[in-house]
Amino acid sequence: MKKRSLFRQLIIGLLLLLGFYLLGIFAYGWSGDWQPGPEPTALIPDQSASEKTLTDSVLTLVSWNVGYGGLGAESDFFYDDSGIWYSGSSMIRSPKNLVEKNLNGVLEFLDRNKDSVDFFLLQEADIVSDRSYNIRQYEAYQKSLPGFAADFAVNYKCDRVPVPLLEPWNAYGAVLSGLASFSRYPPAEATRHQLPGHYPMPDRMFQLDRCAALHRFPAPGGKDLVVINLHNSAYDPGDKIKAIQLPYLRDLALAEFAKGNFVVLGGDWNQCPPHFRFDTFMPGNTQGYLQGNLPPDFFPEDWTFAYDPTVPTNRKVRDPYLKGKTFETLIDFFLVSPNLKLTAVHGIDQGFQFSDHQPVMITITLL
């Protein structure tokens, strides 16, 4: 009887200890939760453009979720496998040498394309984060693109992301990350737009605060070219949060088009384009994954979704990447207004060497 009583007391004590530990985490998260307001805020330029005005009518843009340098082909990610409690056999963060390898791959890509591309829209770029060993990635991207205007819209700011919860000694740590936008021309306006919708508590305290970065460039003919860098919500069962974010983006873009402006949206939508089968690259072999589509009536029919249906842009990170085995889909693309002509679109197949996403490049003509 005494042994049973001691065992029961031990279990109760452990449960109480776990409860106090979790309560402490949530109290800390609540007190330090960064909550940007709903109003658009000006983005501070961090680098100036060498060109003074936009004079060309033919422009090339690239969008790439660079995966904070931590999700190259060799890596998996515990959150996709074990969830918030423990890491299991998956990585919480990639080894530093892999982060450096991935960053160098991104920098080489930027350097190789800087003479032919006018706009680079990057997502999941770290300023300084534990997950990428506090390597100043955004600063490195600026140095790789001299002569490009640069600004940064924060969408992930947390002093300590405590997951996996049962491994406090190995927590994800501090994160400062977001959308890095680079342009050959100086924007007349750059603003961060907080997207509506949020995760339920307590996830909300440690998740991204999704946003879009809008850039306005005076164009020939008295119009503006409006370029929007976006990254919509992931880990969103049923696309419930995205269903709130999408109308905001639609209204923002349509309002600019109604003024006669040229409008381009590009980024990681975390949804497939309308009517695009999410298992196109691995028919029937979904491995339990499900990727939703943007609604067919999301935009008027004369707007153009720009993507390359032959090249996947995203691979899942439950396991390290293996061609033909790892599930691939397409969730990174552009949307262009009817007064722009889409002249080329290319998915750039890198074998997911440097990120769990691949770049998409488009060329447009102002009509």
Which stretches of residues belong to each language-model region?
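Short aromatic-enriched loop/helix-cap "lid" or pocket-rim segments at secondary-structure transitions
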Residues: 72-77, 133-135, 162-166, 192-194, ...
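Surface-exposed cleft-lining segments at the edges of enzyme active sites
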Residues: 89-96, 124-128, 195-204, 231-240
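Metal-dependent phosphoester-hydrolase catalytic domains
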Residues: 4-9, 13, 21-49, 216, ...
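N-terminal, active-site-proximal structural segment of metallo-dependent hydrolase catalytic domains
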Residues: 2-144, 152-167, 172-176
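Conserved S-adenosyl-L-methionine
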Residues: 122, 150-157, 190-196, 344-348
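Solvent-exposed loop/turn segments at secondary-structure junctions
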Residues: 66-69, 125-129, 156-160, 187-188, ...
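Active-site beta-strand/loop signature of hydrolases that rely on acidic residues for catalysis
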Residues: 60-66, 89-92, 99-134, 182, ...
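Beta-strand-turn-beta hairpins that frame and shape the catalytic cleft
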Residues: 50-61, 73, 174-175, 179-193, ...
